[in-house]
Design a protein with these regions (language model features):
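Extreme N-terminal starter segment of soluble prokaryotic enzymes
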Residues: 1-5
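Active-site flanking residues adjacent to catalytic metal/cofactor-binding acidic residues
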Residues: 8, 48, 172
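Short glycine-enriched, charge-decorated loop/helix-capping segments at active-site entrances
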Residues: 18-25, 119-123
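Short catalytic helix/loop segments, enriched in acidic residues and glycine
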Residues: 22-37
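Active-site alpha/beta core segments
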Residues: 34-142
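Histidine-anchored nucleotide/phosphate-binding helix
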Residues: 35, 154-165
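Structural recognition of alpha->loop->beta junctions
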Residues: 78-81, 95-104, 182-201
């Protein structure tokens, strides 16, 4: 059975000192590097949040405060600080991530009108990143998932991977949550278990 590792958004803006810092986000990088080197994956996919300056998920572009939730083109949208803007240092992969192991990179969030948490689709399922077809073309049956952040991009990548017919394993030691609310990480894990995701340490 062929397997792939999906490494979600290990980028400067989500790590220490970044504009949308996930607490201790950079501390999972050694774990991820170890997986990439030792687990004999057939494919290793890196995803990269890759926003234009005018992206509508940015609070400043809507006159809103960070953390507010608005209706954006028919979809509930959390307002975020400006992050992972194309051409800025924040969009780059964290320097400690051994990205030389990657076989494929998926860029997401490029449409300014729709956010894109999942590595497979945007939040309205209008844009397909091509990841599912790529994995299926390589005869991948199992996907293991790590990265940032557990309660957003990792969560929706896991859910979409299940819906696309893959066996999905989340490495809990390879992810961290934003935790806009204190129980978000715990609630996300319970939700993923209910969706059929296996969660391992």
């Amino acid at each position: 059975m062929k397997k792939a590792l999906i490494v979600v958004d290990i980028q400067n803006d989500f790590c220490r000192g970044g504009s949308l810092e996930v607490a201790d986000g950079e501390k999972i990088i050694p774990y991820i590097n170890h997986l990439m080197k030792t687990n004999n994956y057939d494919e290793i996919i890196l995803t990269q949040d890759f926003h234009p300056t005018e992206h509508k998920s940015f609070a400043v572009n809507n006159g809103k405060s960070v953390g507010e939730i608005i209706n954006l083109n028919g979809t509930s949208q959390t307002m975020w600080p400006v992050h992972c803007v194309q051409g800025t240092p924040g969009v780059e992969f964290h320097p400690d991530l051994e990205k030389n192991h990657a076989t494929h990179i998926i860029k997401k969030g490029m449409n300014p009108e729709i956010d894109s948490y999942s590595a497979f689709f945007d939040n309205q399922k209008l844009i397909d990143t091509g990841l599912s077809n790529y994995l299926k073309s390589k005869d991948i049956e199992t996907v293991e998932i790590v990265g940032l952040a557990l309660d957003y991009c990792v969560k929706y990548t896991c859910i979409d991977a299940v819906s696309e017919g893959f066996k999905v394993i989340l490495h809990f030691n390879g992810t961290k949550a934003v935790n806009l609310h204190p129980d978000d990480a715990k609630n996300t894990v319970f939700e993923l278990l209910e969706k059929g995701v296996s969660v391992i340490n």
